Amino acid sequence: MSFVELHCISNYSFLKGASHPEELVRQAIAQGYEGLAITDECSVAGAVKAWRELRRLRQEAPEASAFKLIIGSEFHYEGNCFVVLAPHKKAYGELCRFITDCRRKADKGDYQFSPDALNENIKQGLLLWRPKQSDQEFIPALTKIFSGRLWLLLELSLSEEDDSERELIQTLSSAYNLPVVSSNGVKMHAPERKRLHDALTAIRFNQSVDSIKDRLAPNAENYLRPLNEIHEIYPSFTIQESLRIAAKCAFELNEIRYQYPKEVVPEGDDPSAYLRRLTYEGAHLRYPQGIPENVLATLEKELNIISELQYEYYFLTIFDIVDYAKKSQILCQGRGSAANSVVCYCLGITAVDPTRASLLFERFISKGRDEPPDIDVDFENARREEVIQYLYRRYGRERCAIAATVITYRPKSAIRDLGKALGVDLLQLESVIANYGWRYRGQDWIDEVITPQVSQDNHILTCFKELLPELLGFPRHLSQHVGGFVLSAGPLVELVPIENAAMEDRTVIQWDKDDLESLGLMKVDVLALGMLTALKKCTTYISEITGKTFSLESIPKEEDSQVYDMLQRADTVGLFQVESRAQMNMLPRLRPEKYYDLVVQVAIVRPGPIHGDMVHPYLRRRHNLEDPDDVPLPELKPILKRTFGVPIFQEQVIAIAIVGAGFTSEEAEELRRSMASWKRRGHMGKLMDKLIINLLKKGVPLEYIQRLCRQIEGFGEYGFPESHAASFALLAYHSGWLKYYYPSAFCCALLNSQPMGFYAPWQVIQDAQRHGVIVLPVDINNSYWEHRLEPHSDNTKEGALRLGFRLVKGLSEEAACSIIQHRTDEGFTSLVQVMHLPKINREDLEALASANALASLGENRYQQRWECSGFLYYYQLFSECEYINIDFEPPSRLDNIYEDHSSTGVVLNDHPLAYLREANLTPQCLTAVELLKQKAGLKTYVAGVVINRQRPKTSTGVTFVTLEDETGSINILVWKKTAIAQMDILVKARLLMVYGELDKDEEGRVAHVLAHRLTDLTPHLEELESRSRDFH
């Protein structure tokens, strides 16, 4: 018995298919099918996943070697279903272009289709048609144009509609002499998925399952049936027809041949020679004193490999993008594995000298890796769109699009959608979701969340618990990658369909980065980084202050001990990559003294080193408490020397696998890929087994191997390669240097680059004030839209930081621009002058009054707000009316705190804790400054506004909380036991009092409190809406 299923959708027909493409391929092979067509609706989004799984199975299972995967797509029109199959490469390109046309004519997530469009555009593809009725207008034209390429699709579901289905097919077959082929109309790989398919249908219609029963499939027959059942249900000639159609289909995705864009090479130039010329021109700029011999040797080695692998166009494409950005004064920097390349450094793509950081080019490109290199480039987030639109202009929308990101169901979204489908009380469900400690969930979290509190119906609870694991990880829709662009020499629409993104002027292909990598398509990552915006603004301000051009290159190359001293104190609010509570906790322990220490610092607070229990051994060896030369095998010393014998980076783990466990370069590459995708797929079993067995044979202690394996799994969660950390460490140092030497300019740049980082503007300003920055309030006569530096007698170097109108909540930028445009050198002298300005309304005026931005016009903010609320408007209109003057009492100190915070989010020169302390509402509580003067071990109380909460994925389950009082920041460590016991207070309190034990670093410069008991003081500040930065 033989059969090929020609109509099958996966879960990439979003909310319609109930099985992953991989499940469908595995099941079809297990059932003994000769082939399977993946025909998602107006899409080929699931095709590469199916192809990749088949490729894997062909290597492992002999029965999969002859299995045929056919690529196609289905389209629906007025009850008809049309399935287009691609018999060869030309037909596949035609199908991709047709899908693109259908998608581009509709909003995101939808498509426009008609039989006429099908007739006009599909000249090579094969067409299967499941008709709605026999007298439709389009039928004569369809049968004529698709003569010899058209089949009627017979799909029987063992329901009462089967008889009418047979009759319709027979009528049309006789009338137009059309062959008939059988199909199961597959929507799931096994009948057990019927309940999930019903739930997905309900989610799609935004209804409960019970309310749409008439729209649900009558049974579970739309699955990959066993062959014997297929032969019992369908006439044999319709089954044989499936084999004949499959025989016509020879196309496989590996036939796709990608070509790099060619216009980056001047006409008549050889790409290899052109790349060499640009590289050496850049090398002379990078090394003005002469190119060192080791750099010359590395350059030649890299250029030869690039030429041998024919990657010149790739490097030149990236160079072209970076060159455009630099000419447009857009700050950018390459990172990731590209930082291993001296060629990238000389071309100006990356900023880290690989010879300085001892990075390995083979991590970036090697002959053993059958894939193009991956270069990530960060651009100022405020100006990245300019770079994106440049790419569209240069290559056109047919040859340029953004890669997709598959948005999948995570716990909260799955619970919400499934709960709605099952008809549970949504308000109650939201309450459960909001109050559950997600960061502390264990393996039994489903049982902890889905309780009788969600529903009293035991049947619903059982369904909920059984369906939830199936829904988790299911694709929900396609979104755009954060910056991955695909460029091609020819029409990209003939390689993969392109559709509209949600964002205007953006287009997205239907494949994600894993799909692109599998097929060897070039992806250029055009990423946005807020810190680059801040750094660019900061250097611009310094240029204005000094009267001399200043850039990041102006920062001295020599290591600055004062900057590292600041880092060791964890004085890092606003600094790139080292401002989180977890990083602040690590800095005084690691105590970085030079650039490479900062590389380790950036990388060590990640799941890889943490899960592998490598952090404490590293710190002990770094501070000479353990022997740094003690490694399990002598041959591992060169690999681990720079990190004191402890593996910290992904590259080191891979090197250990090669040198210590005898991995081939191909196996090492597979290990690298597995680490990157383990969290999503979990395919690392065989590699781990080999690693363990071979290291044991070499005499490596089992405990060390187990830690290494945990570290590998940790990298699957999130871990930094050394090259990535090296690029980020450079930006961390740059931001630290600027903060230390130009704190006012740095603070101004951070505020003008919001939102970014861990801290809200208020916290950034409070920190700046502690560093001597003079901060002046928003003022109608002195402020601009952006925050600015203005001359001040108390700071002749940088001046004072004047807060800008952008901080005022409710004030439109248009109104602010009108104020600035019409403001004279003398400034405004009365409220009436401001009222009469164009493009400013009552809401704008009230916002300014609330923010006390009208203080220079006299009177208090309450009086001004009353006058702005409309009374003066009416008085101006009806001047004969008597003006009634109402005097408002000035706001109290606490009122001003409330008003400042609610209107701008910033309280200058005061703090809620100072008020509460003076009101004796926080007795026994030490201030941040007092805390530093105490001895470790002291049991004490502290209190503050909650600035942020962070719980990194550590083995200890610690939560870091930052409090702020009127004197500074207070670091709180909450262990898991305390966190679980007082979860509600921990996650909800905005003003927190903590009783605990004081802990300090060896030099007594950094203190934190180990929490024993938490008290919520928020009721004291009910009107103050201080928002913390939680769990980032």
From Swiss-Prot:
GO terms for molecular function: 3'-5' exonuclease activity; DNA-directed DNA polymerase activity; nucleic acid binding. It catalyses: DNA(n) + a 2'-deoxyribonucleoside 5'-triphosphate = DNA(n+1) + diphosphate. Its main location: cytoplasm. Keywords: Cytoplasm, DNA damage, DNA repair, DNA replication, DNA-directed DNA polymerase, Nucleotidyltransferase, Transferase. Its EC number is 2.7.7.7. One of its GO terms (cellular component) is cytoplasm. Pfam families: DNA_pol3_alpha, DNA_pol3_finger, HHH_6, PHP, tRNA_anti-codon. It is found in: Cytoplasm. InterPro entries: DNA_pol3_alpha_NTPase_dom, DNA_pol3_finger, DnaE2, DnaE2/DnaE/PolC, DNAPol_HHH, NA-bd_OB-fold, NA-bd_OB_tRNA, PHP_dom. It is an enzyme of class 2 (transferase). GO terms for biological process: DNA repair; DNA replication. Belongs to the DNA polymerase type-C family. DnaE2 subfamily. DNA polymerase involved in damage-induced mutagenesis and translesion synthesis (TLS). It is not the major replicative DNA polymerase. This is Error-prone DNA polymerase. The gene is dnaE2.
